[in-house]
């Protein structure tokens, strides 16, 4: 038979675990992590779309990406799937789930057991400028903790990549 103080400690521990699980689930639903970046390039909408849609060329500006494999090869579309080889050795796979030419495309991938949604949005500001918005959202158990960790790490790569992408896209307008 267990001593009363042992039973009390076990019950308190179990209650603590239940409260922690409820807190994580509540955070997951109420405050899911979202990473969003908006920037403007000096290209018409169509040219900005075409430039970014060449995902196999992303390593030229996204230095954390070594290689992008697109299936089927060629143009990005609703049936496209892909895999990236990252400089840290990871090989995340993704599939396009939404494709609205010159407006947005969204692909879905994974990180551990989380599902990550990457939205690439385009908005014409005027005939020579386009606003591009990247939105990264995560869903899954523990997203309030793991999603924030993913966002913290990924945001640094994203900020460096966007700066290089803007330079590359703006330089392409004179060619």
Predicted feature locations:
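Hydrophobic ligand-binding cavity/cleft-lining segments
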Residues: 2-74
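A short acidic/glycine-rich loop-to-helix N-cap element
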Residues: 138-160
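Alpha/beta-hydrolase-fold catalytic nucleophile elbow
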Residues: 135
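Glycine-rich portal/gate segments that line the openings of hydrophobic small-molecule binding cavities
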Residues: 4-13, 40, 59-60, 69-117, ...
